[in-house]
Amino acid sequence: MDSQRTVELTNPRGRSKERGDSGGKQKNSMGRKIANDAISESKQGVMGASTYIADKIKVTINFNF
């Protein structure tokens, strides 16, 4: 639960600030491809686990708890 909560808190920040401006709709469809920032990648950890190397590391650490 902690892992999800942590990622959720990061979600609105990176999404509303940077990604939201670019196009939040496209990110929902192809978020894995559009995600370039560490914030977006960490958020994708919940949806597309093990999509990016950095994403996988963050997911592993969070899920480890």
From Swiss-Prot:
This is Double gene block protein 1. Residues 17-43 are annotated as: RNA-binding. Keywords: RNA-binding, Transport, Viral movement protein. Cell-to-cell movement. Displays RNA-binding activity. InterPro entries: Tombusvirus_movement (IPR007982). Coiled coil: none annotated. One of its GO terms (molecular function) is RNA binding.
